[in-house]
From Swiss-Prot:
Non catalytic polymerase cofactor and regulatory protein that plays a role in viral transcription and replication. Stabilizes the RNA polymerase L to the N-RNA template and binds the soluble protein N, preventing it from encapsidating non-genomic RNA. Homotrimer when phosphorylated. This trimer is stabilized by binding to the L protein. Binds soluble protein N, and ribonucleocapsid. This is Phosphoprotein. It is found in: Virion; Host cytoplasm. Disulfide bonds: none annotated. Signal peptide: none annotated. Keywords: Chaperone, Host cytoplasm, Phosphoprotein, Viral RNA replication, Virion. The gene is P. It comes from the Viruses. Phosphorylated by host kinases. GO terms for cellular component: host cell cytoplasm; virion component. Its main location: virion. It comes from Bovine ephemeral fever virus (strain BB7721) (BEFV).
Length: 278
């Protein structure tokens, strides 16, 4: 029955070697698990980046720490890091301050050279007031200047060039010829205003007294005065200002009935040729 007895196998083993084998096996399994985790995270990140519906966050910007020792070594200085740090701060200023002369010295604006001297109005007796404009805009500019009582050949003169442009140059007030022209123009304007004012006053004075105009149909006269006249003072003023030449009060009133829209409305029922001044 010897063949039925189990064989007992015994042998010696190295416990230290077995411990090292177990540690190596554990370390190998941990490496495989870590590699698998990194692969899955990279795959997930690539899927997120490729997904247009996911909002990507911009990388944050952190301040850079300056190592003072490295700064001193790089600049070859000893214990002078304050000066180097100030240079870094000054060089990082994005809005440097410029003086007026530095900013406008020989700068160009739309093709014209502008110097700092031209920007200053206090240039002695030589006034450099020139405004270049296009020839097509001259009429509009002159009309605007006339609204401010600025007259050609009196307050300014016009010079043309070969570039389809003109210059409006301010005339000096010290020029005697310009001064005489200015006085003549002012006197002419004052005469016109006096004439206009006298005409307006004469017509208004007559309306205060009243006028009688014969009816076109029927008998009798219609009395018109300042209280019942159809036009307004503004309307009357605009019409009287267009009267040319010497006119009598009766002629100016007839002119008023022909030119004023308000007076025209009653002109059809009146015979203005038969008028009596009260």
């Amino acid at each position: 029955m010897s063949h039925l007895k189990p064989k007992i196998m015994t042998g010696a083993y190295d416990a230290e070697k077995l411990r090292r084998n177990l540690q190596e096996q554990i370390a190998l399994e941990e490496d495989e698990l870590e590699n698998q985790t990194d692969f899955e995270s990279n795959k997930e990140e690539s899927n997120i980046n490729n997904n247009p519906l996911v909002i990507k966050q911009e990388p944050s910007i952190y301040p850079i720490e300056i190592n003072l020792e490295d700064l001193e070594k790089a600049n070859g200085m000893e214990e002078d890091w304050e000066n180097s740090l100030m240079k870094i701060i000054e060089s990082s200023d994005v809005t440097p301050k410029l003086s007026w002369n530095d900013e406008f010295e020989n700068c160009t604006y739309k093709g014209y050279v502008v110097s700092s001297e031209d920007l200053c109005n206090d240039s002695g007796n030589q006034e450099k007031n020139e405004v270049p404009i296009k020839q097509s805009s001259l009429e509009d500019v002159a009309q605007v200047l006339s609204l401010f009582q600025i007259r050609s050949e009196v307050d300014y003169k016009i010079e043309k060039d070969n570039k389809n442009q003109v210059k409006i140059i301010k005339l000096s007030k010290q020029d005697k010829s310009v001064k005489s022209k200015r006085n003549d123009v002012v006197n002419q304007d004052s005469d016109k205003h006096m004439k206009y004012d006298s005409n307006f006053d004469a017509v208004m004075d007559q309306f205060q007294k009243g006028i009688r105009i014969k009816k076109r149909f029927g008998k009798g006269y219609v009395k018109i005065n300042a209280d019942n006249m159809p036009g307004t003072y503004h309307d009357l003023s605009n019409v009287i200002s267009t009267v040319k030449g010497e006119k009598t009060v009766e002629e100016m009133i007839r002119y008023l009935f022909k030119k004023s829209k308000r007076f025209k409305s009653i002109n059809k029922t009146l015979n203005i040729d038969e008028m009596i001044l009260c």
